[in-house]
Amino acid sequence: MKRKVLLMGRSESGKTSMRSIIFANYIARDTMRLGVTIDVEHSHVRFLGNLVLNLWDCGGQEGFLESYLTTQRDHIFRNVEVLIYVFDIESREHQKDIKNYKSCIEAISQNSKDAKIFCLIHKMDLVPEDQRDTLFKNKEQEIRQASLPLKPTCFRTSIWDETLYKAWSSIVYSLIPNVKVLEYNLDKFCKICEADEVVLFEKATFLVISHSARKVHKDVHRFEKISTIIKQFFLSCSKSQANFQAMEVRNSNFAAFIDAFTSNTYIMVIMSDPTIESSATLLNIQVAKSHFEKFINSTSN
């Protein structure tokens, strides 16, 4: 099953850098050597086994954008499942950026009226921390106004923290069919294990696919932080030619289990009940693997 995803925005807004971090295992500092995208770069990213993201990374130079909106209009904007538009927060051509975005929205409305729209307000690490909330809200309001009658989902992002994983996890989640069936079964598993939380990660990208929680946690970005940390750990393992299989982290307050789950996922189980032995949790994970394999395969077919 293929899903066409457009990645658009002005030149040097950070589109190719974020794609390389999420899908090609780059670390943030290595993206500095990436060149400028010329015209359209196509990549096919296999996700959850049978789901293929047909990612069109569109160069943002003015000449290319004009071509996308005229001679290539139908070719670029037809059969699109998701449009990801990246705004560079430091751009000095603010009005032109909004005008170009509105032109893309018009083309999407005409050629792929059911496409989902995600706007990433990028390079937020360059904004003083005490100004980020206000700046993001103002930018989001302006983007929503420019998008009417479509309703975009906006995220603040940076390649230097977990916000990039938060945004892309949400984007990929929107592309997974029958994901509610998976969530229902994950809820049941969480209750059976008497876990505080259970999180499912895609194996190649370590993006969050789904999660279930029985206890409220104040840090809403915790999963994305874990994605970032574990992916860095995976890269370290691969450099030393070691294969990651499982991990258990325990202190006086909780135990966290991260284990290879199905052929395309990892699972994380968080436990705080001291009366439940590690062996019981590990057995539950082992027993659930074959059960979840069929649900995850069905969601990507």
From Swiss-Prot:
What domain of life?
Eukaryota
Record field: transmembrane: none
Task: Provide the alphabetized UniProt keywords.
Answer: Cytoplasm, GTP-binding, Lysosome, Nucleotide-binding, Nucleus
GO BP terms, alphabetized: cellular response to starvation; negative regulation of autophagy; phosphate ion transport; positive regulation of TORC1 signaling
User: Which residues of the sequence carry a binding annotation for GTP?
Assistant: 9-16, 57-61, 122-125
UniProt-annotated location(s): Cytoplasm; Nucleus; Lysosome
List the signal peptide residues: none
Q: Which SUPFAM superfamilies match?
A: P-loop containing nucleoside triphosphate hydrolases (SSF52540)
A Pfam short name: Gtr1_RagA
Which terms in the GO cellular component ontology are assigned?
Gtr1-Gtr2 GTPase complex; lysosome; nucleus
Does the entry feature the keyword GTP-binding, yes or no? yes
Q: Does this entry carry the keyword Lipid biosynthesis?
A: no
The UniProt GO MF terms for this protein read:
GTP binding; GTPase activity
> In UniProt terms, what function does this protein have?
Guanine nucleotide-binding protein that plays a crucial role in the cellular response to amino acid availability through regulation of the TOR signaling cascade.
**Family according to the record:** Belongs to the GTR/RAG GTP-binding protein family.
Query: What protein am I looking at?
Result: Ras-related GTP-binding protein A
